[in-house]
Regions:
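Active-site acidic carboxylates
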Residues: 76-78
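Exported/periplasmic ABC-transporter solute-binding proteins
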Residues: 2-27, 32, 36-37, 41, ...
């Protein structure tokens, strides 16, 4: 019996989740999986409004946990990976965070800290380095991490805070620097089965697959930290 699965996924998973679905469908070729990518905050807001998702794969633990704590879903949140923050550019060489202080840098992209955990982590880095007051006017915010990436990719921003998982290793112009994990709180990413997903057997099958050795290897390949 072919089944349908609707997933709400954080934008930093745009590349990795497509690879994971491709792998999953080798064993489940008849099942249809549709994914809505957005910031964790926006997806959370849609789920509270009863959006018909079966699984919510977030960039934080807070929002999935809230869904359980507020009894919006009977399932508990499960951490699946830790995200890695980078500073990157499409045409400038980046080998340290010193470039943030360069007066030639006029626009810095990051995800909206209120909606996206990677944006929150980016602000923590600037706060930690005491650079926030001086750089505030240069920051342009993307609604999600992938929109912040677009700003850099289209050169609307010279540099940006991004997710290691979205870095295209084949792009020869791209340069990125992995930010010291001591500068931001861990980006612990969790998922949760929604109330809708309770009636969809495929939700459990796909969720279990995400914790399989095969899936863990794919997460690693895309730069996530998996224990």
């Amino acid at each position: 019996m072919a089944q349908d699965l609707k997933i709400a996924a954080t934008a930093n998973l745009t590349c990795a989740l497509k690879a994971l679905v491709k792998e999953f469908q080798k064993e489940h070729p008849k099942d249809a999986i549709s994914i809505s990518f957005n910031s964790s905050g926006k997806l959370y807001a849609q789920i509270i409004q009863n959006a018909p998702f079966d699984l919510f794969i977030s960039a934080d633990i807070t929002r999935p946990k809230k869904l359980y704590d507020e009894k919006i879903t009977p399932f508990k949140e499960e951490a699946y990976a830790k995200g890695v923050l980078v500073l990157w550019s499409e045409n400038l060489k980046i080998d340290s965070l010193e470039i943030l202080k360069d007066p030639k840098i006029k626009r810095i992209a990051m995800a909206n800290p209120k909606l996206a955990p990677y944006g929150k982590a980016s602000m923590e880095v600037l706060d930690h380095l005491k650079l926030t007051p001086g750089l505030k006017s240069k920051i342009i915010y993307g609604a999600s991490i992938s929109q912040a990436h677009q700003f850099v990719a289209t050169k609307n921003a010279q540099i940006g805070f991004g997710a290691l998982s979205l870095m295209d290793k084949r792009d020869k112009n791209l340069s990125y620097f992995i930010i010291d994990k001591a500068l931001y709180n861990p980006i612990e990413q969790a998922l949760i089965t929604t109330k809708n997903g309770a009636n969809n057997p495929l939700a459990k099958v796909f969720k279990d697959f995400l914790f399989s050795p095969k899936a863990r290897a794919i997460f690693k390949e895309y730069g996530y930290i998996v224990d």
